[in-house]
Amino acid sequence: MAKKDYYEVLGLKKGASENDIKRAYKRLASKHHPDKNQGSKEAEEKFKEINEAYEVLGDDQKRAAYDQYGHAAFEQGGGAGGFGGGFGGADFGDMFGDIFGDIFGGGGRGRQRVVRGEDLRYDLEITLEEAVKGTTKDIQINTLAHCDSCGGSGAEKGSKVETCPHCHGSGRIRRQQGFFVSESICPSCHGSGKKIEKPCRSCHGEGRVHKKENLSVKIPAGVDTGNQLRLAGKGAVGENGAPAGDLYVVIHVREHHIFERDGSNLYCEVPISFAIAALGGEIEVPTLDGRVKLKIPAETQTGKLFRMRGKGVASTRSGYAGDLICRIVVETPVNLTSEQKELLHKLEESLQGKDLSKHAPKSSGFLDGVKKFFDNLGKSDK
């Protein structure tokens, strides 16, 4: 089945900005996260698709390659790879090294290929508080670890491990036809360069077995959804004692019930009473460090923004903290008593008349506009 266009997966058009890509990824990853759609295979596949798209479009170099060549840029070792299928693949450096080595003196001659293990991915969901302040999380991964029975050699204890007679230990078979030389993986030893007399029964000669492994991951302060933490050597081990790949921990920050995050800034809505909005006063607003007092000037309207500097998220690069931006929402009183309603009626009456433009300029302007509209409408009918 043909792969979907990565831009379409994220609901974007080609040429979308870096921020657009990040916002789309955060929104879709949160919507289709397996924890929110337990048991849904469709959501799980969609989540993988979204992450694969962001893995490419969220990286400038990979995105440039994708824009030019499409999915072909990442097939057969084209560069992007994928978490689910491993980050490995053919290495262009090795490929060209073999070609030019053959032409200019056989640089790759007799060299044994050591193929390291696959890179792994782990999706980790954390709270906003943990993302802002940093934390340590214990995780469990499914991986390929060294076989305890054979110590990773792939051979039964006491069994001989000899040099492969077909490739003489290089792990590669070379064939020459006229001026052309081709090289391929040795079919006898599968590239290991060794022949095992009796393969280990526990790992069937691979030198590695499936295991669950517990790890402790340190999350630095300031991480955001889509950030990746690389744990070198914590991926799957390679066959027959080859080194391990890396583990990539991909961060997903859970939605917060009060704050919204945009980069290093935090946003929240702060409701205030009708009286405080009109007369002014002092209120308490929440921050991730605790409650902070905020002075509200008289005649504050809904939508007014107050910036609290340094109360946002510290950048992982610069270390400087962003701001907390509070948006005021004037709350209309409800469940009023008869006495309270009477007081509001009196207030309304006192604000009407000639002084309306002074006390309620927007209402006055709106009413004047409505009057002019109907006056003009009446003239056009005549």
UniProtKB/Swiss-Prot annotation:
Presence of keyword Metal-binding: yes
Metal-binding is among the record's keywords: yes
Subunit structure: Homodimer.
Native organism: Haemophilus influenzae (strain PittGG)
Gene3D superfamilies linked to this entry: DnaJ domain, Heat shock protein DnaJ, cysteine-rich domain, Urease metallochaperone UreE, N-terminal domain
Domains: entry comment: The J domain is necessary and sufficient to stimulate DnaK ATPase activity. Zinc center 1 plays an important role in the autonomous, DnaK-independent chaperone activity of DnaJ. Zinc center 2 is essential for interaction with DnaK and for DnaJ activity.
Name of the protein in question: Chaperone protein DnaJ
Zinc finger (CR-type): 134-212
Note on cofactor: Binds 2 Zn(2+) ions per monomer.
